[in-house]
Curated annotation (Swiss-Prot):
This is Peptide methionine sulfoxide reductase MsrB. One of its GO terms (biological process) is response to oxidative stress. It holds the Pfam family SelR. GO terms for molecular function: peptide-methionine (R)-S-oxide reductase activity; zinc ion binding. The keyword Zinc applies. Belongs to the MsrB Met sulfoxide reductase family. Keywords: Metal-binding, Oxidoreductase, Zinc.
Length: 155
């Protein structure tokens, strides 16, 4: 279900409160554009039905029906929950030219987008598990910013 969510960034005080909830690895990946090691992340082999939300702000990012096994060692999806929830940015770090993907609401680093996915989009959204929280189908979506916009929707 694609519904409208408030994409206003967290206020400075909300952002500081959210930063305080991160462990060192989450901070490195979400806020410093890091990457977790392949094949040893918690959501790679998750096959449950549900929604993957931003670990930092709770915005729905991907649905399990768009997840596929890419063989790369990171959770991969062929399309986002809605394109409005993903921001794309040109990335030339580490001597490569790539498209970085970030949460459209809080600007947290999620991973990268590659043009080698399956039909129908032929895109591969390659994500860090650390950047995501999995919400099983039938569970209320998180409302980390206390705006009341997520709590009416179940995955």
């Amino acid at each position: 279900m694609n519904v409208a969510f408030d994409l206003t960034p967290p206020s400075p005080s909300q952002r500081e409160a959210l930063i305080a909830t991160l462990n060192a690895e989450e901070h490195r990946i979400l806020l410093q554009h890091g990457t977790e090691a392949p094949f040893c992340n918690r959501l790679l082999d998750n096959n449950q039905l549900g929604t993957y939300t931003c670990r930092f702000c709770g915005l729905p990012l991907f649905h399990s029906n768009a997840k596929f096994k890419s063989g790369t060692g990171w959770p991969s999806f062929f399309e986002p929950y809605t394109h409005a929830h993903i921001r794309k940015q040109h990335d030339t770090s580490h001597g490569m030219i790539r498209t970085e993907i970030l949460c459209a609401r809080c600007n947290s680093h999620l991973g990268h987008l590659f043009p080698d996915g399956p039909p129908p989009t032929y895109e591969r959204y390659c994500l860090n598990s650390v950047s995501l929280t999995f919400i099983p189908t039938g569970t209320l979506l998180p409302d980390q910013l206390h705006r009341g916009d997520n709590t009416a929707y179940r995955t």
